[in-house]
Amino acid sequence: MVICDTPADKQPRRERRKDARPGELMDAALSLFVEKGFAGTRVEDVAMRAGVSKGTLFLYFPSKVELFKAVVRENITGRFNEWNTTLDAFQGTTSELVHYCMQQWWERIGATQASGITKLVMSEGALFPEIAAFYRQEVIEPGNALIRRVLSRGVDRGEFRPVNLDYAIYSLISPMIFIIMWKHSMAPCCPMGDEGQLNIDPQTFIANQADILLNGLSVCPGRNNA
């Protein structure tokens, strides 16, 4: 009996390994950026963790800054198209959309290692203006635009009061920044279950913050909604 190779089988193992290297390097870099920060991460340590040489890393990423940019694009920036498509297709109320978006953000970003990128930029952005400017362009600006679309939807449909949307954006962002900073600072020191615990369940926190925010935004009979 003749066994025919599949297309995948015909690809040399070394070539398959080569194709996987950028992803392996970005995974290693993400872990180290979150653990040690941008300044504390050395490219040779990234290469070692990925199981390749420093020279191999530079074949794919010419500098640590370019490696950082690739990590951000891979783990955060690439999701904005998906989220905008979801917004376009959403059939529920805008209050339901806000709850959905905040919980989805936690599941896709907040609960993953990628959330540590935000803490890194907030901590080290002033020292590395190039990565701060990149993060603003690739994450903050499209993120703000997406949130503004959500809030505008509510105003246009008569569900939300006509507030200053440019500032209302930060009412949604602030709880997310808080829970990220908590996760990567105090949370490891405050295990869940301790009596008098200070730890916070992220999903409960996000749902509660969304509820408080929406009660402030929603049009209510008998209240000055202007």
List the predicted regions and their residue ranges:
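Helix-loop "lid/cap" segments that line or gate small-molecule binding pockets
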Residues: 103-110, 118-126, 213-217
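C-terminal peripheral helix-coil segments that are non-catalytic and often amphipathic
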Residues: 1-12, 96, 100, 104, ...
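Amphipathic alpha-helical packing segments from all-alpha helical-bundle domains
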Residues: 96, 107, 111, 116, ...
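Basic, helix-initiating cap at the start of DNA-binding domains
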Residues: 1-36, 40-52, 59-66, 92
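Amphipathic alpha-helical linker/stalk segments
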Residues: 69-101, 107-109, 113, 117, ...
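Hydrophobic/aromatic residues within well-ordered alpha-helical segments
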Residues: 21, 64, 75-79, 94, ...
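Amphipathic, non-transmembrane alpha-helical scaffold segments
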Residues: 18, 26, 72, 132, ...
